[in-house]
Amino acid sequence: MTEHKSGFVSIIGRPNVGKSTFVNRVIGHKIAIMSDKAQTTRNKIQGVMTRDDAQIIFIDTPGIHKPKHKLGDYMMRVAKNTLSEIDAIMFMVNVNEDIGRGDEYIMEMLKNVKTPIFLVLNKIDLVHPDTLMPKIEQYQSYMDFTDIIPISALEGLNVDHFIDVLKSFLPEGPKYYPDNQISDHPEQFVVSEIIREKILHLTSEEIPHAIGVNVDRMIKEDEDRVRIEATIYVERDSQKGIVIGKGGKKLKEVGKRARRDIEMLLGSKVYLELWVKVQRDWRNKVNFIRQIGYVEDQD
């Protein structure tokens, strides 16, 4: 009988290297928020990948960055604490970029970790194959890795091969989650992240990190329709105007795009109602940060 492998794998890396894209690719559903703006992942997103011979729980940690407020401090603590809880570490980098200070900081942090560490060179679809070996050698000069795998999370290139390699290093174990469970977050959290993603896509650089989303109400009205009421929080009146847009046009577009993804997630029709409220300096208010879902694990 074939042994069953299971384990927890942390994905760590600088902002925008493709961690969320990878999680969504291997899970087959949108669990982690994707955007071209930095620091879009705020919580540990546990995506559960179940195969006949293995179950891997991927923890998509916030991108490593220098904190600028209490929410940033929280994001960094989540990233570092995750390393002590897992069976393997994926250190993901953008192969199309030079090694930066953030990469060096992460490698310094990983040097004393005993867990298997895989260097995953993402975005190989953007570079010539001849550039891969020099980049690999650069990273190897900093530290030893359990294995080094080039992939494209967006295109799916070499992702299955990486999963096979990863499985070989995981311990034998049971299924921690049912076959049909793809995340340990409640549906409301995933819904709020989908709404936040659409705002990130549609607003300018000043807005994204001032955005918080809370699902106030989510009820099944009948067999094939779910009613969702959510509040979008910003820090300034000017930001509220940007999110709403002229004549409410931008907010309507946010709702339209979010509704489409939420209906795919829930498998039913969705009535989505959105409000925008100003909560001044909310990223420095610990109680409010907890209130809208960014809560550290309790021991």
From Swiss-Prot:
Family of the protein in this entry: Belongs to the TRAFAC class TrmE-Era-EngA-EngB-Septin-like GTPase superfamily. Era GTPase family.
Organism of derivation: Staphylococcus epidermidis (strain ATCC 12228 / FDA PCI 1200)
Domain KH type-2: 203-280
Keyword Repressor applies: no
Subunit annotation: Monomer.
Compartments in which it is found: Cytoplasm; Cell membrane
BP term (GO), one: ribosomal small subunit assembly
Positions bound to GTP: 13-20, 60-64, 122-125
UniProt keyword Endoplasmic reticulum present: no
One function term, GO molecular function aspect: ribosomal small subunit binding
UniProt-recorded name of the protein: GTPase Era
Function (record text): An essential GTPase that binds both GDP and GTP, with rapid nucleotide exchange. Plays a role in 16S rRNA processing and 30S ribosomal subunit biogenesis and possibly also in cell cycle regulation and energy metabolism.
Transmembrane segments: none
Residue span of region G1: 13-20
Signal peptide: none
Gene Ontology CC annotation, any one: plasma membrane
